[in-house]
Amino acid sequence: MATTDFIAAIELSSSKISGIAGKKSSDGSIQVLAYAREDASPFIHKGAIYNIDKAAQALTSIINKLEGQLNNSIAKVYVGIGGQSLRTVRNAVSRTLEEESIISQELVDEICDENRDVPLVDMSVLDVAPQEYKIDNTLHVEPVGVAGRYITGQFLNIVARASLKKNLEHSFEQAKVEIADDLLVAPTALAKAVLTENEMRSGCALVDFGADTTTVLVYKNNILRYLSVLPLGGNNITHDITSLQMEEEEAEKL
């Protein structure tokens, strides 16, 4: 019988799929108890799954390896989503009130919901980073409780091709692996893990150099301000080095 005692996560990248499982300690840290990986090059390119059958087989193999090391079943896994089509787009939603009123949480929630419903062609909104709210002529990060008649929410939407999310979900469904909660945006999850609060507040850029892609994030005042994925990674450098008549294995080491 599957148990929820363990916390498990799976990361999908162009070079490999990694799975990890453990238990949460009393101090909040995670004690790693199992790890497994599979080559992803036969079914992932630029961070996107293109062969669902092979991806499902690899996911099944990883879960089996993790459960074998744990000597127990895994109920759900946390999954991060990334890939070349991942990027940010700006959007604004405005409301005019009948008279000056105190901005409520309900109104802010309605504005956020309207932002998520913005029509996109072949794209899906994966997550949203609220930037600030303009109430009358003043900008606020926390709008609830502020008096005003005009409010505009400014948002940074993290979007990706609809097929990116669809193929990932189909792969997990075929492997009969249940995803815990919503999909995590892998680059922002990484940023929360490696950047300090001071770094994100004062302003910094995080560059994640992968096999097929390079992801760039910019933070300022503890808010994500920019995210983009470049279609270049370590494999491009390796291929350039092999043109100097060097074996790929040696080029990879360099």
Protein language model features and the residues they cover:
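Nucleotide/phosphate-binding catalytic cleft detector across ATP-hydrolyzing
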Residues: 1-16, 20-205, 223-225, 234, ...
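Glycine-rich phosphate-binding loop of actin/hexokinase-like ATP-binding domains
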Residues: 202-243
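Small-residue helix-packing motif on alpha-helices
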Residues: 251-254
